[in-house]
A protein has these predicted regions:
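Membrane-interface helix-loop junctions and terminal tails of multi-pass membrane proteins
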Residues: 1-258
Length: 258
């Protein structure tokens, strides 16, 4: 493996780790405190700040994708070498998995106090939702939940393309991570109700895989009408659509130089 690619993979690993350790951490605090130490607003704010901090960690090396859907969209629309897509995605997944383990270790005693040591996925003592997303009971896996994830990720990637386009009105130098964090906060505050706005395959599957091996059993893949695949597939499609929409409406409409 080339040293340059290894450096990029490590940056994506650490950036995603920072994103997930803070993001999952805030959900753990809210759930385990039974909403006495936070609420849905604090979750949205913390996830937005988590994105910002993760981006600052990795931006100078890779641009801080921290999300396989973003990586895929950049390969499709921005000439990111296809050979980097899988290594980046694996690194992002690994960062999310390790971050999930750290949150589990930190809150282990609180989890046991909450559920009595009996790991449950859903229900009053369910704790798997601290790590991965699960849909509301009324939400269909397809098309409802699928559309939810496509729309959320399309908004994410489309706006990211806008705020990083030098021909447009990009975020001021060094402030792009702040703007992206605000964007994620906004998505959570407007489209978080249906299923928790995963909008990132690594953010959902890495923590879900951790809960599978840490005692929550295969129910983490069966719950929510086998919801697990939706936050993997739909964001990848949504990201490509969002990038296409930006380019079709704005990106390809700028006059050619000269």
């Amino acid at each position: 493996m080339k040293k340059g690619l290894l450096r990029e993979m490590l940056a994506e690993f650490l950036g995603t780790f920072v994103l997930i350790v803070f993001g999952v951490g805030v959900v753990a605090q809210v759930v385990l405190s039974k909403h006495t130490a936070g609420d849905f607003l604090s979750i949205n704010i913390a996830w937005g700040l988590a994105v910002t901090m993760g981006c600052y960690v990795a931006a100078g090396v890779t641009g801080a994708h921290l999300n396989p859907a973003v990586t895929l969209a950049l390969a499709v629309h921005r000439k990111l070498p296809w050979g980097k897509v899988l290594p980046y995605a694996v690194s992002q997944l690994a960062g999310a998995f390790v971050a999930s383990a750290i949150v589990f270790l930190t809150y282990h005693d609180a989890i046991n106090a909450f559920d009595g040591g009996v790991r449950q996925v859903l229900g009053a003592q369910g704790t798997a939702g601290i790590w991965a997303t699960y849909p509301q009971p009324f939400l269909s896996t397809f098309p409802g939940g699928f559309i939810d994830q496509v729309v959320g990720t399309a908004l994410l990637v489309g706006v990211i393309f806008g705020i990083t386009d030098s021909r447009n009105s990009p975020a001021p130098a060094g402030l792009a991570p702040v703007v992206v964090g605000l964007l994620v906060l906004l998505i959570g505050a407007t489209f978080g109700f249906n299923s928790g706005y995963a909008i990132n395959p690594a953010r959902d599957f890495g923590p879900r895989l951790f809960t599978f091996v840490a005692g929550w059993s295969g129910e983490v893949f069966r719950a929510g009408h086998a919801w697990w695949w939706v936050p993997i597939v739909a964001p990848c499609i949504g990201g490509v659509i969002g990038g296409w929409a930006y380019d079709a409406c704005v990106g390809h409409r700028f006059p050619s130089a000269g």
